[in-house]
């Protein structure tokens, strides 16, 4: 009886609640890692598709694809899965002046790439972006202030970029590591934004989400291969696309506050795509006439 009683109690312990085979739960750390890897894989697949389109379409279409939310879009989608609508709206507000910083990065690179190496041109452009991003933290941004910063920036930079847009493009020979490298860089950025968002808050997350990783990888990969002027032409053609991207960020802020994160993200994406399609259509009509 004692043996049977001990055995019975032992069976209760072994088969008790929480320890049955069907009730075993995955470790929270493992769930986080697997979820993060899945998000990185989805982002990488998105970047690979966009990169193939960019390389096969010439400087104008390539620039329009590059200015779609290829890296910022996945970052914000995954942030929306982890945070509420207020977080996303505040992040978008912080992203507005960063979009202005990106056009200054583009102008700096385009000017320097005419005569200097990829590392020098990109390094100086990245330094400008970092300085402007750091300076933006000194201000309490509003929607009107962010829009004004973009309006002034584009009014200055777009005319200066225009003279660099038209260059004969050489044949681009792709290396086997180009797209995997670009995809891994963007996936790493998304992973960094998602992982740090809980600690750094919406404003830093919004800044990090707009780090110009797609433009940077394009500069560093294409410049040594086809030269500074053709690469600068691709970047210069992206100026008008960045304007639409800025409008999309403003739409994200307003729509998220009114309708929630899902609707805000969809409307922001629709804004960016519609803007770039309008640019493409306008360009085709000009060529036709």
Protein language model features and the residues they cover:
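Small-residue-rich transmembrane alpha-helices that serve as helix-helix interface/gating elements
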Residues: 151-153, 212-213, 263-277
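Hydrophobic alpha-helical transmembrane segments in multi-pass integral membrane proteins
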Residues: 79-80, 134-141, 187-199, 245-261
């Amino acid at each position: 009886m004692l043996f049977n009683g001990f055995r019975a109690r032992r069976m209760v312990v072994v088969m008790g609640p929480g320890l049955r085979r069907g009730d075993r739960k995955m470790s929270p750390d493992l769930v986080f890692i697997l979820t993060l890897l899945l998000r990185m894989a989805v982002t990488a697949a998105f970047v690979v598709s966009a990169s193939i389109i960019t390389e096969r379409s010439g400087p104008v279409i390539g620039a329009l694809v590059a200015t779609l939310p290829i890296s910022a879009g996945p970052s914000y989608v995954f942030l929306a899965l982890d945070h509420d609508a207020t977080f996303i709206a505040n992040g978008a507000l912080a992203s507005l002046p960063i979009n202005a910083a990106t056009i200054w990065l583009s102008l700096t690179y385009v000017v320097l790439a005419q005569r200097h190496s990829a590392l020098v041109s990109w390094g100086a452009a990245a330094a400008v972006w970092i300085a402007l991003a750091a300076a933006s933290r000194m201000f309490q941004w509003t929607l009107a202030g962010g829009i004004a910063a973009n309006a002034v920036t584009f009014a200055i930079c777009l005319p200066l970029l225009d003279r660099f847009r038209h260059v004969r493009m050489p044949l681009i020979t792709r290396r086997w590591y180009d797209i995997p490298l670009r995809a891994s860089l963007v996936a790493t950025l998304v992973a960094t934004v998602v992982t740090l968002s809980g600690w750094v808050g919406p404003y830093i997350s919004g800044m990090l989400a707009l780090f110009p990783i797609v433009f940077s990888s394009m500069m560093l990969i294409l410049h040594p291969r086809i030269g500074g002027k053709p690469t600068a032409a691709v970047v210069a053609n992206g100026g008008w696309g960045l304007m639409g991207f800025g409008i999309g960020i403003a739409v994200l802020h307003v729509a998220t506050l009114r309708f929630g994160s899902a609707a805000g993200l969809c409307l922001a994406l629709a804004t960016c795509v519609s803007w770039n399609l309008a640019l493409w259509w306008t360009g085709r009509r000009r060529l036709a006439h």
